[in-house]
Amino acid sequence: MPQLDMSPWPMVIMSMILTLFYITQLKMLNFTFYNTPSSKLSMPHKHKTTWELKWTKIYLPPSMYQ
């Protein structure tokens, strides 16, 4: 039984990978990527939390009387 000559296989594999990469790039060239809407046009909505709505007094620790 004759043995299979393996010398051309690395070249075949490399050319296949290169061809697939080239075809993929050509397919992506026709694809339109839409830009995400910029946030500069719309003002960011600030959510009000409950602790921002009311004023809280900060107490100091009890001091020693002299």
Curated annotation (Swiss-Prot):
<keyword id="KW-0066">ATP synthesis</keyword>
<dbReference type="GO" id="GO:0015078">
    <property type="term" value="F:proton transmembrane transporter activity"/>
</dbReference>
<keyword id="KW-0496">Mitochondrion</keyword>
<comment type="similarity">
    <text>Belongs to the ATPase protein 8 family.</text>
</comment>
<protein>
    <recommendedName>
        <fullName>ATP synthase protein 8</fullName>
    </recommendedName>
</protein>
<feature type="modified residue" description="N6-acetyllysine">
    <location>
        <position position="57"/>
    </location>
</feature>
<keyword id="KW-0138">CF(0)</keyword>
<keyword id="KW-0406">Ion transport</keyword>
<dbReference type="InterPro" id="IPR001421">
    <property type="entry name" value="ATP8_metazoa"/>
</dbReference>
<dbReference type="InterPro" id="IPR039017">
    <property type="entry name" value="ATP8_mammal"/>
</dbReference>
<dbReference type="Pfam" id="PF00895">
    <property type="entry name" value="ATP-synt_8"/>
</dbReference>
<keyword id="KW-0472">Membrane</keyword>
<comment type="subunit">
    <text>F-type ATPases have 2 components, CF(1) - the catalytic core - and CF(0) - the membrane proton channel. Component of an ATP synthase complex composed of ATP5PB, ATP5MC1, ATP5F1E, ATP5PD, ATP5ME, ATP5PF, ATP5MF, MT-ATP6, MT-ATP8, ATP5F1A, ATP5F1B, ATP5F1D, ATP5F1C, ATP5PO, ATP5MG, ATP5MK and ATP5MJ. Interacts with PRICKLE3.</text>
</comment>
<keyword id="KW-0375">Hydrogen ion transport</keyword>
<comment type="function">
    <text>Mitochondrial membrane ATP synthase (F(1)F(0) ATP synthase or Complex V) produces ATP from ADP in the presence of a proton gradient across the membrane which is generated by electron transport complexes of the respiratory chain. F-type ATPases consist of two structural domains, F(1) - containing the extramembraneous catalytic core and F(0) - containing the membrane proton channel, linked together by a central stalk and a peripheral stalk. During catalysis, ATP synthesis in the catalytic domain of F(1) is coupled via a rotary mechanism of the central stalk subunits to proton translocation.</text>
</comment>
<keyword id="KW-0812">Transmembrane</keyword>
<dbReference type="GO" id="GO:0045259">
    <property type="term" value="C:proton-transporting ATP synthase complex"/>
</dbReference>
<dbReference type="GO" id="GO:0015986">
    <property type="term" value="P:proton motive force-driven ATP synthesis"/>
</dbReference>
<keyword id="KW-0007">Acetylation</keyword>
<dbReference type="GO" id="GO:0031966">
    <property type="term" value="C:mitochondrial membrane"/>
</dbReference>
<keyword id="KW-0813">Transport</keyword>
<feature type="modified residue" description="N6-succinyllysine; alternate">
    <location>
        <position position="54"/>
    </location>
</feature>
<feature type="modified residue" description="N6-acetyllysine; alternate">
    <location>
        <position position="54"/>
    </location>
</feature>
<feature type="transmembrane region" description="Helical">
    <location>
        <begin position="8"/>
        <end position="24"/>
    </location>
</feature>
<keyword id="KW-1133">Transmembrane helix</keyword>
